[in-house]
Design a protein with these regions (language model features):
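Acidic, glycine/polar-enriched metal-coordinating patches/loops
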Residues: 1-117
Length: 117
């Protein structure tokens, strides 16, 4: 689990998936009120060879998604991915006290599924 600090404008973190893994990687906001903006998105490419490759884009809901949980191959646990986190606001949207914008490309396998939670 990596817990981000409270979002503030200008904070910027990048995470590289340097090895395929099993288990769970979770990228969490500092609290349930530090959410990912509704424009936050992750593109998950199927890791298979060209010709069988597909991709799916997933967005945070902008209301209560405060975690990215990669706990299955379908959610991007394969080597080569990257996730960027940019602090965009304090005082946020709705009940949020802080907002992160997240984007990235990760690699999964099978029936690709959202890692936002």
């Amino acid at each position: 689990v990596v817990t981000l600090p409270t979002a503030a404008a200008g904070l910027n973190y990048s995470f590289i998936i340097g090895t395929t893994f099993t288990g769970t990687f979770s990228l969490d906001g500092a609290s349930a009120n530090d959410i990912y903006s509704s424009s936050s998105n992750l593109l998950i490419w199927d890791k298979d060879a060209p010709g069988t490759v597909s991709a799916k884009q997933f967005y945070a809901d902008g209301s209560d998604d405060d975690k990215i949980v990669m706990d299955a191959d379908t959610k991007g646990r394969f080597v080569g991915g990257r996730i960027n986190c940019i602090g965009i606001a304090t005082g946020g949207q709705g009940s949020a006290t802080a907002v992160w914008h997240v984007d990235g490309i990760v690699y999964g396998d099978g029936s690709l599924a959202t890692p936002f939670a």
